[in-house]
């Protein structure tokens, strides 16, 4: 699989081409330390609230070096190695790795000017199995039952396929 591009717009275009029509694909452009970025995740698989808390906590601990960062690679290095982000954050370098982490329920921060992303372990997966509905016995066909909200059903289905 190809490496991530240092251009944020190219990475977002690839992701939108792959997942843009999915109802649960979430992409939000942000600015961190004067650097454009984007948060990408699957709603229902990753906790958006946990992600915002994690990022706000890390960003609120400003150091003088963070105010003078020249670009995405420096912001990446400072966030991943010199901030209060937990150990469950790790670098993402390829498109294959990015899609694997997204479909595993992780959120990824992409930065303009950096050919890597930061994956955050903020999964909020529903842990129930997909099983046959108790009230409907089928002799033929599919025996899976999806009785939750659409985004919960999508996350269960993504986990089942994975």
Predicted feature locations:
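Membrane-embedded alpha-helical signal segments
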Residues: 1-162
């Amino acid at each position: 699989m190809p490496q991530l591009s240092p251009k944020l717009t190219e990475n977002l275009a690839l992701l939108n081409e792959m997942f843009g029509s999915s109802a649960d694909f979430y992409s939000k452009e942000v600015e961190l330390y004067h650097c454009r970025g984007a948060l990408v995740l699957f709603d229902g698989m990753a906790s958006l609230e946990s992600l915002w808390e994690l990022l706000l906590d890390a960003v609120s601990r400003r150091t003088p070096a963070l105010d003078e960062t020249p670009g995405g690679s420096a912001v990446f290095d400072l966030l991943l190695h010199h901030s209060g982000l937990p150990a469950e954050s790790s670098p993402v370098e390829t498109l294959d790795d990015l899609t694997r982490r997204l479909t595993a329920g992780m959120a990824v921060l992409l930065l303009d000017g950096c050919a890597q992303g930061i994956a955050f372990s903020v999964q909020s997966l529903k842990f129930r199995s997909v099983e046959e509905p108790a009230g409907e016995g089928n002799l033929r066909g599919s025996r899976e039952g999806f009785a939750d909200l659409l985004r919960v059903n999508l996350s269960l289905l993504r986990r089942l396929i994975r």
